[in-house]
């Protein structure tokens, strides 16, 4: 069971970021998947989640600018970037609760906004 993020890269403010989280070994109809990020020198910050039902929930700051969608085996994040969005972005599987135990993590992908 694994998840893996697509490649990040170098972006400019106002660019649209599109990241894909590819899952294997489990079904998105049975698990919630979260997108989280970690800016340099900072802690983890959640962006949003996609529940097994297909419902999405977002952090307050992300509601107006982020969209999470899914296909059969991917969870996709689209985000309108600002200069403060440089971070390593991760997807993770949640096993319990709204933002409960995240037991399967991707390696992360670095997004630089400059």
Curated annotation (Swiss-Prot):
Superkingdom classification of source: Eukaryota
Modified residues (Pyrrolidone carboxylic acid): 1
GO cellular component: extracellular region; immunoglobulin complex
UniProt-listed GO biological process terms: adaptive immune response
Domain Ig-like, residue spans: 1-107
Keywords (A to Z) from UniProt: Adaptive immunity, Immunity, Immunoglobulin, Pyrrolidone carboxylic acid
More about this protein: This chain was obtained from antibody to type III pneumococci and was isolated from the serum of a single rabbit.
Classification via PANTHER family: IMMUNOGLOBULIN HEAVY CHAIN
The protein, known as: Ig heavy chain V-A2 region BS-1
Record organism: Oryctolagus cuniculus (Rabbit)
Taxonomic lineage from the root: Eukaryota, Metazoa, Chordata, Craniata, Vertebrata
